[in-house]
A protein has these predicted regions:
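Nucleotidyltransferase catalytic core that binds NTPs
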Residues: 8, 12, 24-218
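Polyanionic/metal-chelating signatures
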Residues: 5
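Long alpha-helical repeat scaffolds
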Residues: 14-19
Length: 218
């Protein structure tokens, strides 16, 4: 955990000071922005870690080094919030942890709330990044592998938001317990902003027209 904590703190400082890098080294804006998003994705991936202390450290970095930073420009915070808000909200609810994690979550959300209030006070508009095209996979990638992740990434690069559903049980597969498989997928896609786990409380049978109709309406 100590090594992970140091690595996460380093990533947080890198994100805080990243705007100086773009001034010093001339490169296309797309390349610079992609690197920034990779750094943010690495921090978010730690929110899906199976170790609670790692998740707590990730929350601390997100709160203090990103949304609570006095160095990071408000427009950069807004850009990152727009991209990661949905993923962050999902990860906070997926791995709630114990009582101590509750205080970490509260502190992080407090930093985010202050950022939003301050940004809007001075005329900024905080939005979440959305896409019109949706791709849904009903248990196709179960068990989930790195090859499946690459397929999901390629689809989201085409402008889709990808949702992955985890089958409850299948007689045709020697599957691991449902929550274990869900955790594996969650850890694998935590750094992908437009790839999400489908909610567990909404079962979908693609052979059922009523389920397909409900899926389109969501």
């Amino acid at each position: 955990e100590r090594i992970v904590s140091v690595a996460l703190d380093t990533l947080g400082v890198l994100l805080e000071c990243y705007s100086r890098y773009t001034v010093r080294f001339q490169e296309p804006e797309e390349v610079s922005e992609e690197r920034r998003m990779k750094l943010l994705g690495l921090i978010l991936s730690c929110l899906a870690n199976y170790r609670e202390q790692v998740r707590q450290e990730a929350l601390l970095v997100i709160g203090q080094h990103i949304f609570g930073s006095q160095i990071l420009a408000e427009r950069d915070k807004s850009r990152m919030f727009s991209l990661c808000a949905k993923k962050l909200l999902f990860l906070l609810n997926e791995n709630k942890g114990g009582e101590l994690s509750l205080y970490y979550r509260a502190a992080t959300l407090s930093h985010i709330d202050r950022f939003i209030a301050h940004y809007q006070l001075f005329g900024g508009l905080v939005e979440t990044s959305t896409r019109e095209k949706i791709a849904f996979f009903p248990g196709t990638f179960d068990p989930f592998t790195l090859s499946h992740k690459e397929i999901a990434k390629k689809i989201q690069e085409l402008g889709f938001t990808v949702f992955l559903a985890i089958d409850e049980f299948s007689w045709s597969k020697k599957t691991q317990p449902h929550l274990v498989r869900r955790q594996i997928v969650n850890m694998s896609i935590a750094d992908e902003f437009y790839v999400h786990l489908f909610p567990d409380n909404t079962p979908v049978n693609i052979a059922n027209p009523a389920d397909l109709r409900r899926l389109r309406e969501m």
